[in-house]
């Protein structure tokens, strides 16, 4: 659900926290259109467009998992500030022994995050930003605390037709492990994510297209599963179809497949007035890792829509992670500055 983080902890940090982020493929570091939640991926996106904005987000995920967040922003001269709180509840789970026998008793699991965001305008077209993120998780009676940070930069032309963003997310590690016993191992790192994104808005058509390149700090996005590790092949020349099928079963991935697993593509239909938007995106990593072989699904695709009605923004998004498992998200944003006038 939260992205495939491999050996790191706090994988929920990879989950899109709003309908807009979900519709953009789960992550976006370049789009600046007054949507407050995009600053959660790149703190430099926080701009004067979001002054005194309050945004509430809710997500219903697979298997009864619920997530909610609230974000508020305020500007002071050339400085932009925002604070967000996120809560993820995995619901009730049953105790079971090592053989899978359930006792009938249940326990809960929750993740919580506070996001303190700052950005500063360094000219008419360039901003930088940073965020500090205390993180707390409790699973049954085991708890963990971590501290993370994000840094980012954002550029856009004066007419906003072209936007470029760069962000390094989740710099940090656990300060308190879930378990401090002799076999608990070292403190885990957070799921680091170096991203570069851009988008272009056509001058004479209500269309914006863009791409995000994520996880740039790591070429091989595979992980070990059932004793098999993902490995990248430069060529399958000379291999029969049976040999290639066997190699795939053992974790082989072609280089161009791995390259596209680093990309997210999106298409925005949005008029100049920005009174509404319709967004379609494709995340190849989600599809490659979560789609079930030989079965049709929309894994990797996300669809979203939003309305901007005077002082209120509404957003809705839908994505399928695997067959029968969906995420539905809704967002409500209020322009408090306009409401008080």
Residue spans of the language-model regions?
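Subset of outer-membrane beta-barrel
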Residues: 2-341
């Amino acid at each position: 659900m939260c992205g495939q983080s491999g050996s790191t902890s706090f994988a929920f940090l990879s989950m899109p926290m709003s309908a807009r982020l979900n519709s953009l493929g789960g992550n976006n570091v370049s789009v600046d259109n007054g949507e407050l939640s995009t600053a959660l991926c790149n703190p430099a996106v926080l701009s004067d467009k979001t002054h005194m904005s309050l945004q509430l987000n809710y997500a219903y995920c697979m298997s009864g998992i619920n997530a909610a967040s609230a974000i508020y922003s305020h500007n002071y001269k050339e400085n932009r500030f925002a604070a967000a709180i996120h809560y993820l509840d995995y619901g009730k789970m049953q105790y079971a022994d090592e053989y899978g026998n359930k006792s009938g008793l249940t326990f809960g699991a929750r993740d919580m995050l506070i996001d303190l965001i700052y950005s500063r305008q360094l000219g008419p077209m360039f901003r930088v930003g940073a965020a500090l993120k205390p993180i707390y998780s409790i699973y049954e009676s085991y708890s963990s605390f971590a501290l993370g940070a994000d840094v980012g930069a954002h550029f856009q032309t004066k007419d906003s037709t072209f936007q470029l963003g760069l962000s390094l997310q989740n710099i940090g590690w656990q300060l308190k492990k879930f378990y401090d016993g002799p076999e608990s191992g070292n403190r885990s790192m957070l799921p680091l994510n170096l991203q570069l994104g851009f988008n272009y808005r056509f001058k004479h058509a209500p269309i914006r297209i863009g791409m995000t390149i994520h996880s740039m700090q790591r070429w091989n996005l595979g992980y070990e599963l059932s004793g098999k590790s993902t490995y990248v092949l430069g060529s399958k020349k000379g291999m029969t179809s049976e040999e290639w099928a066997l190699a795939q079963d053992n974790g082989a991935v072609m280089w161009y497949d791995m390259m596209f697993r680093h990309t997210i593509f999106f298409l925005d239909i949005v008029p100049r007035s920005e009174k509404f938007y319709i967004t379609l995106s494709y995340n190849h990593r989600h599809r490659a890792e979560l789609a079930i072989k030989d079965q049709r699904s929309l894994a990797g695709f996300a669809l979203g829509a939003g309305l901007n009605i005077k002082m209120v923004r509404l957003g809705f998004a839908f994505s399928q992670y695997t067959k029968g498992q969906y995420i539905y998200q809704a967002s409500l944003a209020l322009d408090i500055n306009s409401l008080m006038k």
